[in-house]
A protein has these predicted regions:
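Conserved nucleotide-binding/hydrolysis micro-motifs of P-loop NTPases
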Residues: 24-25, 43-45, 67-69, 94-98
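Short secondary-structure boundary/capping segments
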Residues: 33-37, 77-80, 105-108
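Acidic beta-strand-to-loop metal/phosphate-binding motif
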Residues: 17-19, 57-69, 91-93
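Glycine-rich phosphate-binding loops that contact phosphosugars or nucleotide phosphates
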Residues: 45, 49, 68-83
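C-terminal or mid-to-C-terminal helical accessory/interaction module adjacent to the motor/catalytic core
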Residues: 85-133
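Flexible glycine/proline-rich, aromatic-decorated loop/lid segments
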Residues: 50-53, 79-81, 116-122
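Hydrophobic alpha-helix feature that most strongly marks membrane-spanning transmembrane helices
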Residues: 55-58, 82, 86
Length: 133
C-alpha cells in the first residue's frame, strides 16, 4: 500500500483515506496538501491492504480516474472494501483527468471543495452508474 507510512497520521486525523490507483497520484496529492492518500500501487486492491487501512480508519474514499477503466477499478475496489467492513465513498474525476493531473491544475482549496461536493456513497454511485447505462 504505497504511501501508508507518510499518510497514516493524516488518515487518523481526517478519519478517512483517499485510495488512488498509482504512486504518482499519491505524490501529487501530498504535494497539493492532501496527505491522507494511499495507492494500491497499480495492482488490484487486496484484503491485506484493506486490513492495513483499517488500522487507521474505517472510512475510505475511492478516488479513481473518470474513464471506463477507472470506473471498473472503482467497482472492484468498492466490493472488496465493503467485504473488509469499511465505509466507502466514491469520487470520480472529470473524464480525461486523474488525481495526478487534477491536483497539479488546482489549488488545495479547490481540490478539497471538489472532493467534498462530489464524493458519493457507494449506493448513489452505483445507482447513477446503472441509470446512465
Amino acid at each position: 500500500l504505497y504511501g501508508i507510512f507518510q499518510a497514516k497520521n493524516a488518515i487518523r486525523k481526517e478519519d478517512f483515506c483517499f485510495l488512488v490507483e498509482g504512486y504518482t497520484d499519491v505524490i501529487s496529492l501530498h504535494q497539493a496538501g492532501i496527505e491522507n492518500a494511499v495507492a494500491s500501487s497499480g495492482t488490484a486492491l487486496t484484503e491485506d491492504q484493506i486490513k492495513l487501512i483499517r488500522r487507521f480508519t474505517e472510512n475510505v474514499t475511492v478516488l479513481f480516474d473518470g474513464d471506463a477503466a477507472g470506473i471498473r477499478a472503482a467497482l472492484r475496489g468498492i466490493d472488496l472494501i465493503l467485504k473488509g467492513g469499511l465505509n466507502v465513498r466514491v469520487l470520480l474525476l472529470p473524464d480525461g483527468e486523474d488525481p495526478d493531473s487534477y491536483s497539479r491544475k488546482h489549488s488545495t482549496n479547490t481540490l478539497t471543495d471538489y472532493f467534498k461536493k462530489n464524493a458519493k456513497d457507494f449506493i448513489s454511485f452505483k445507482i447513477d452508474l446503472y441509470a446512465a447505462e
